[in-house]
Amino acid sequence: MGDSRNTGTISNLSSALRQVNIGSGQDQKNINYEFSNGLNNNVNDNGNHNLVNTNEDNVNKDGSINTNMMSRQVPIQHTHGSQLLQQERMNEQQFNPMEYSRISKFFQNQPMEGYTLFSHRSAPNGFKVSIVLSELGLQYNTIFLDFNLGEHRAPEFVSVNPNARVPALIDHGLENLAIWESGAILLHLVNKFYKETGNPLLWSDDLADQAQINAWLFFQTSGHAPMIGQALHFRYFHTQKIESAVERYTEEVRRVYGVIEMALAERREALIMELDTDNAAAYSAGTTPLSQSRFFDYPVWLVGDKLTIADLSFVPWNNVVDRIGINIKVEFPEVYKWTKHMMRRPAVIKALRGE
């Protein structure tokens, strides 16, 4: 597939990830997907950067992973930090209000129903929202903002998200309600879906489970994503090479994954002991390892016995962690299996492909 880049500018240095073309590592080819330049989008047709580039043939027609297909490596563009800062200042001075016309036209003629997602082709948090929209089967369109044109600073968009970042969502069925921050958006979607259908899909009707879902969701948005973002920034984009910062944030990402790994391992053990009753005594005695159980690769989730937004919120960021030198398949096998199960879901595949 084509790969359109404009490596000369970056308008949000605080999120270095947005400027990185991140390819999949050889060991993680099973769980990396392409956020393609060809994403289906009726509103936007510009060619911004891809977060992950992987051959679409990795996805079989039945939605499973083709483990024999090698991922297409895309080199990271190393641009000196001072040049990026200088270019950002130039961008700030050169924006023309006419460049906002595409955004202005949308706000003058908004749909009557469904959702509009404002995202960016290299924004993991934006794809986090599209995954949940897709899983819930909701009608939505995506506008991929062009940061080089300053569309995220268009007055109409700032009225939706005063932080001038993505994602932001407009719920046209609620009088064009605007929601920003990915965690808040996910909670709005599942709560509204539950209220309207009576089905707690990706959510729970149990208050205790809801509290645990919230805890993991906030852990992802406040710990998991920022630490990966900082590790990428200091590894590839900071004006000076500060090894202590690279090491600090990389190790913090490992610590975060250790928390998730332990939780999933506990869920795995509980599931095996519950379902594999014939061998439970041997597992308890330690004479037979849990890895011998036929349920060792069975999907387990962070909360309860079903997939929720707590799990799905991690998916896009798990796709890029190999670029900071962490191989989750080797270091965190439960995280790897968990991610692979989610990446095989048809709705997730559709969301990441933009279908």
From Swiss-Prot:
PROSITE patterns referenced in this protein's UniProt entry, alphabetically: GST_CTER, GST_NTER
Domain GST N-terminal: 113-197
SUPFAM superfamilies reported for this sequence: GST C-terminal domain-like, Thioredoxin-like
One GO cellular component term: cytoplasm
Domain GST C-terminal: from-to ranges: 206-355
Domain of life the protein comes from: Eukaryota
Biological process according to GO: negative regulation of transcription by transcription factor localization; nitrate assimilation; protein urmylation; regulation of nitrogen utilization
InterPro entries from the UniProt entry: Glutathione-S-Trfase_C-like, Glutathione-S-Trfase_C_sf, Glutathione_S-Trfase, Glutathione_S-Trfase_N, GST_C, Thioredoxin-like_sf, Ure2
UniProt keyword terms in alphabetical order: Nitrate assimilation
Pfam families: GST_C, GST_N
GO MF assignments: glutathione peroxidase activity; phosphoprotein binding; transcription corepressor activity
Subunit-level organization: Homodimer.
Homology family: Belongs to the GST superfamily.
Physiological role: Plays an important role in the cellular response to the nitrogen source. URE2 gene plays a major part in the repression of GLN1 and GDH2 genes by glutamine, and is required for the inactivation of glutamine synthetase. URE2 gene product may catalytically inactivate GLN3 in response to an increase in the intracellular concentration of glutamine.
Protein name: Protein URE2
Lineage per the UniProt record: Eukaryota, Fungi, Dikarya, Ascomycota, Saccharomycotina
